[in-house]
From Swiss-Prot:
EC number: 2.9.1.1
Reactions catalysed, as given in the entry: L-seryl-tRNA(Sec) + selenophosphate + H(+) = L-selenocysteinyl-tRNA(Sec) + phosphate
Record protein name field: L-seryl-tRNA(Sec) selenium transferase
Description of how the protein assembles with itself and partners: Homodecamer; pentamer of dimers. Binds only one seryl-tRNA(Sec) per dimer.
Family: Belongs to the SelA family.
GO-annotated biological processes: conversion of seryl-tRNAsec to selenocys-tRNAsec; selenocysteine incorporation
């Protein structure tokens, strides 16, 4: 070790001296003595590494308190940070899918602050069932006999198969053997549930006779899977649920359906693409239907199964149900969301998912044009800002081929360098509330469909 290195090491302050510095008092009050001491030890280790490797003091040596403040603030940030979603995907899986209605947020807050009647019957002063209140509500909305709630739709499909067809064959059209995000595949789920997959038909065409011919003494279910994240077009043929139910009745085999996204309203009345409705499948006689809570329904992540009382009872008594059950916060948010459907006249305003999906292209374009001048004043030296038409998507595997006309603010670098776009997008991701867009065709696009809090957005963008 050189004398110069020893001199540098000797300039490092003692932790006790730093702790008594007035600049550290507020940090100790806010973050606690233990956190601050642990951080200072790490900072001293970092400083020694810098001296050893560069023969200099660290850049932040002159202001230990400021460096400590920055590090503590960064460490205190939640792993689940709010962002401004301007990707053009409304139900963005990586960004948490459906935004919750104010009623759902308030219901969750109340459920977290006090004991609740999760599994307590006030009438009989005994144990109740956690799904009962929601089951009553779901039956009222869908026309089903009973309902069961688990933590997501993948769990719902697993439970549905394991409880009703373990050790038996499940007949599914080859064109419906879907894979969703995370390599979740229907054949894999069937194996985990103890079922044997019996494929029928071809990728593009399946007939009623294919189901009839597949049924044998070991058939447990006939299953329909809604291809919510892809579409097969052209020379195609499928068997609708109502026809499959008739086959099931004829052969005494229950019919179940995985609806995936699941919609409780006719989306076409809002000018949106039509999606199969739960009520239609229940009316057709499907024994069990599963769907997601956090997609088109607009609620929290949950798997919902509605259908025949006797088959729901099989699900409720299966050992997997306890492992997959939803917690009180999920149930509180889901109940509040479902209650919004009892007032359909106000649904498009109160349910954030539907409100965002139904925004008109004209209103989105007007919003983008209104903000353009202020953003150009901030970014115009490096980028050309334009308001351009674009197409939003619903996301989360919902209506995969359908797009929603929208408008975007685009940023094009004057020098044409793509690295400037990457740097700009990276800079926005470091904002206190990160702004997330997408880079495409030599531009950075900010689709304004999901922008509701303009003031927060402009505060971030003009920093």
């Amino acid at each position: 070790m050189t004398s110069e290195t020893r001199t540098l090491y000797s300039q490092l302050p003692a932790i006790d001296r730093l702790l008594h510095d007035s600049a550290f008092l507020s940090l100790r009050d806010r973050y606690g003595h233990t956190q601050v001491v642990d951080l200072l030890r790490r900072m001293l280790d970092d400083a020694r590494d810098v001296i050893r490797n560069t023969q200099t003091l660290p850049d932040w040596y002159a202001d230990w308190a400021q460096e400590a403040k920055l590090r503590l603030e960064n460490a205190a940030q939640s792993a689940l940070r709010p962002v401004i979603n301007l990707t053009g995907t409304v139900l963005h899986t990586n960004l948490g899918r459906a935004l919750q209605a104010q009623e759902a947020i308030e219901a969750v807050t109340q459920a977290m602050r006090a004991p609740v009647t999760l599994e307590y019957d006030l009438d009989g002063a005994g144990r109740g069932h956690r799904d009962r209140a929601l089951a009553t509500l779901l039956c009222r909305i869908t026309g089903a006999e009973d309902a069961c709630i688990v933590n997501n739709n993948a769990a719902a499909v697993l439970l549905m198969l394991a409880a009703t067809a373990s050790g038996k064959e499940v007949v599914v059209s080859r064109g419906e053997l879907v894979e969703i995000g995370g390599a979740f595949r229907i054949p894999d789920v069937m194996r985990q549930a103890g079922c044997t997959l019996h494929e029928v038909g071809t990728t593009n065409r399946t007939h009623a006779k294919d189901y009839r011919q597949a049924v044998n003494e070991n058939t447990g279910l006939l299953m329909k899977v809604h291809t919510s994240n892809y579409s097969i077009e052209g020379f195609t043929k499928t068997v609708e649920e109502a026809e499959l139910v008739e086959i099931g009745r004829e052969l005494d085999i229950p019919v179940v359906a995985d609806l995936g996204s699941g919609s409780l309203v006719d989306l076409s009345q809002y000018g949106l693409p039509k999606e199969p409705m739960l009520q239609q499948l229940i009316a057709a006689g499907v024994s069990l239907v599963s769907f997601s809570g956090d997609k088109l329904l607009g609620g929290p992540q949950a798997g919902i199964i509605v259908g025949k009382k006797a088959m729901i009872a099989q699900l409720q008594s299966h050992p997997l149900k306890r492992a997959l059950r939803a917690d009180k916060m999920t149930l509180a948010a889901l109940e509040a969301t479902l209650r919004l459907y009892l007032h359909p006249e106000a649904l498009a305003e109160k349910l954030p998912t539907l409100r965002l999906l139904t925004r008109s292209e004209a209103s989105i374009r007007e919003q983008a044009q209104r903000l353009q001048a202020r953003l150009a004043a901030r970014y115009g030296d490096e980028f050309a800002l334009e308001v351009k038409p674009c197409l939003s998507q619903i996301g989360s595997g919902s209506l995969p081929v359908d797009r929603l006309p929208s408008a975007a603010m685009t940023f094009t670098p004057h020098d044409g360098r793509g690295s400037r776009l990457e740097a700009l997008a990276a800079r926005w991701r470091t904002l206190p509330v990160p702004v997330i867009g997408r880079i495409y065709d030599g531009r950075l696009w900010l689709d304004m469909r999901c922008l509701e809090d303009e003031s927060r957005f402009m505060e971030m963008m003009l920093k």
